């Protein structure tokens, strides 16, 4: 049976993804200005992976916000950020990944490019990497690897997240000469990661989501108790 008949939402999934991406980055004029929205909306976390430094971003990235709190020299457990992540996970779970995440949609669009497609069936063990990324890069390193002031870097955002380059560094550098001049080896490293994800997304279906995304890992942990649950149609498996 067609999965779109089983789930009416699937029929409108592309429109929902586009709408969610637009709402998450609603401040479109900022792309031309090379500025960031800095209003009260930035105190609210969006559900998907979306860079705080994107000119159009209407809210904060939950991964970046969580790292900022635990990497602070005055670290206190953030009930707000942890609570909102749990709320997103319990209410929506992996629905966020499939319908509301801008970077997930970006990878899906790339996968539509005509090319040979490769199965990830034999690469299933790689899916556990995202849990390691969540534990090590999002939690442990920002908490434990601190400088003399007791502050930790947002390791995932700084060294691994390709969304920051795509939505933040690239559009800002196009309109801001100062940012262009400041780009260095770290930008080159992150740009290479983004390029690898782009190429990988053409031949694999959402490789970053499957293997490296810590936000997806967190939501996956709550999938069994979420109101929207991801179920596998075994008759469709090959």
Kindly label every feature range from the protein language model.
Residues 1-238:
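Non-ligating segments of multi-cofactor redox enzymes
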